Amino acid sequence: MVGFDDEKKKIVHELVDINNANRSVISMVGMGGLGKTTLAKSVYNDFEVKRSFDIFAWVIISQEYTIHEVLKRIKSEVSATPLADTIQDLSVAISEKLKKGKYLIVLDDVWKEDAWTELLKVFPDVNNGSRVIITTRFLNVAKIADPTIQPHELRLLNIKESKELFLRKVFPRQNTETCCSDDLLDSAHQLVKRCGGLPLALVVLGGLVSTKPQTKDAWQKVVESMKRQFVKGGDKCLEILALSYNDLPHYLKSCFLYFGCFGEDMNIPSKTVIRLWSAEGFLPTENGKTIEESGFDCLVELAQRCLIQVTEHEYDDGVKYCQIHDLLRDMCISEAKDNRFLEIYQNDTVDRATMPNAARRLIIFNEIKTLNYSNSKLRGLFYSLGSYQRLDFAALNGQLGKFKLLRVLYVNKLVISEFPSEIK
């Protein structure tokens, strides 16, 4: 945890403080990409914390949420057993379960005050030292959650910390003090200064540089690229993310843009991504390698460049699940729209929608009743629904035959008795 060791110690102390029996809410506040979730995970998995609580739950809230879905996630995490599935029954069941032990609940990425006020009643205060952790970009959310406790406002990294984090990403398995020459250190200093101390920018830039030769000339080319791309007064983080995207080989750009097809904070199975890439013909064919092996190579390179995060490994250290940071996902979607790679509809009903640029993929993130839509160039139709949403395939009755070029139909949550005749 470069730059946040002292903050972590303070938070751990607040969590395990035996002199505070009240249920307390500890908030971490800061802009996107500052490392709130990384710090929260480090605290959550700390040995002293793990042995101090009985019940644990980690729930991502995000911008688009429903209280019903959040409660279902909490119920699943704490193994509560409601008799029914209503908000009221879920709330009662969770509260009763949490009364039985000392709990630690993490609410990650809370955007609105309403999210906390709606959830407050399910976290009982039985004077046993239970805790709730909130990560948020907004100070008002932190203050309303627990006015008695000062929020932890995370700071930007200083230049020394920035260089340390950057070099850790460039040389993940090496000692930076012995493998980094003075010439490279000089280039590193020029690079990290442009990141403004933002951890996400530093790790993405470090991931980019890790793919380059370890020479002064190669690193200086990255410095010059940054100088050409950066606009005075522009968002440095977004410019660095764009620089890293533009550095990708052509085939890997398409693979990366595909992550815009998945919901925010979704834990994505690697095999699902690889099958989709394969169906689209994105994966390079190399002698002696299967399509699946090429797909895993692409995932590994995207992870090395810190454009995606590996959330779970296979037994052989391969990628099992992955995720994309919400800022990177925002950039991914923006770039994908500009290139007519995809278009997103999040309204309840897509009714005779007309794509202005005939994008090749349509992404739907919410449940819909009907799909009355035409696009002769559509290659992919994605229903990327929330954890507890379901698609009734009746919404597609008579629709799929319109999409003559359709190569991919992706539905992650499905209620179906038989397939539509168009795809039997």
Predicted regions and their residues:
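N-terminal flanking helix/linker immediately upstream of nucleotide/cofactor-binding cores
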Residues: 1-34, 38-47, 54, 60-62, ...
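Conserved beta-strand scaffold positions in the cores of enzyme catalytic domains, especially
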Residues: 25, 56-58, 132, 151-154, ...
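Loop/turn-to-beta-strand initiation segments
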Residues: 100-105, 127-133
